[in-house]
Amino acid sequence: MNITVLGAGAWGTALAIYLSARHHVTLWTRNTGHLAELAALRVNQRYLPGQHLPDSIHLASALSDALEQAELVLVVVPVAGLRVTLQRIAALNQSLPLVLGCKGFEAGTAKLPCQVVEDVYSAEITCGVLSGPSFAQEVAMGLPAALTLASDDDAFARRIASEIHTSILRVYSSSDVVGVEVGGALKNVIAIAAGISDGLAFGNNARAALITRGLAEITRLGVALGGHRKTFTGLSGIGDLILTCTGDLSRNRQVGMMLAAGCQLPEILLEIGHVTEGVYTVREAHEMGRQLQIDMPVTQAVYSILYEQIPVESAIRNMLDREPGAETD
């Protein structure tokens, strides 16, 4: 299959490397300087150092060239750049099937990635979303992982899952696009909280409690938005949440640890140097929770630290001092 990967960040590059073993892959970046580096070094030194780009991967900076032979397009750009990227694709080809590899809510609209697709395309288009517990570095190294590919089109989800599934990267199909996307978005917010907990040396018990209660509020919002409750017990729910809250490669967890150390957000983002979606997702999640009257205490704590200048210790204390309730509430 001819697959074009749009976005040469860490995850886009890792997917391109993985897929190139069985497919014809084109990797696109709009940054011509970055493209020149990739072509010269055959390594993505900016975002995925140490991982060789196979010679079979074609590199492109012109979107028309990248899409010319494509049978499937993986869109792996930050959510902030998704709409404009989709508009450029749609202007060239309205019929190419898409699989989205980005996680979050669009700022200002609070729309999920597949909802942005619906906004952009004038006609119905086949679209899926790829999500689950997957650090780019490990996928590029060929270490085992498992993902979910969700689409409203069951046949498409099963077919594409089968195309990209191997014994190293197992891919399961789903029809719950909303549930898969909500899980992928909100786990980044909970991971910031987990990083704060770890940074304050609260211990393993506290981290486990945060993950569990975090899953509860992810599920509450996800179901309210139309997701299926059982989805949140799967790879794109609890699976991705556990990895992002515990793994040392988690950028969102790193944000939390640096907040606990007293660093300010601009300094943190500059040092990490990669997009950390949880920082932006928390604003939309907080507002949706408020509008829908959904109890989201972990999200509220992270939001208050990042955007209301509440000291870390005060925000955590406010969360811990909440009145007890039934676990299933």
Swiss-Prot record:
Its EC number is 1.1.1.94. One of its GO terms (biological process) is glycerol-3-phosphate catabolic process. Pathway: Membrane lipid metabolism; glycerophospholipid metabolism. PROSITE patterns: NAD_G3PDH. It is found in: Cytoplasm. GO terms for molecular function: glycerol-3-phosphate dehydrogenase [NAD(P)+] activity; NAD binding. It catalyses: sn-glycerol 3-phosphate + NAD(+) = dihydroxyacetone phosphate + NADH + H(+); sn-glycerol 3-phosphate + NADP(+) = dihydroxyacetone phosphate + NADPH + H(+). SUPFAM superfamilies: 6-phosphogluconate dehydrogenase C-terminal domain-like (SSF48179), NAD(P)-binding Rossmann-fold domains (SSF51735). The active site is at K187. Sn-glycerol 3-phosphate binds at K103, G132, S134, K187, D240, S250, R251, N252. It holds the Pfam family NAD_Gly3P_dh_C. Disulfide bonds: none annotated. It comes from the Bacteria. NADPH binds at W11, R30, K103, A136, R251, V275, E277. Its main location: cytoplasm. Belongs to the NAD-dependent glycerol-3-phosphate dehydrogenase family. NCBIfam families: PRK00094.1-2, PRK00094.1-4. This is Glycerol-3-phosphate dehydrogenase [NAD(P)+]. The gene is gpsA.
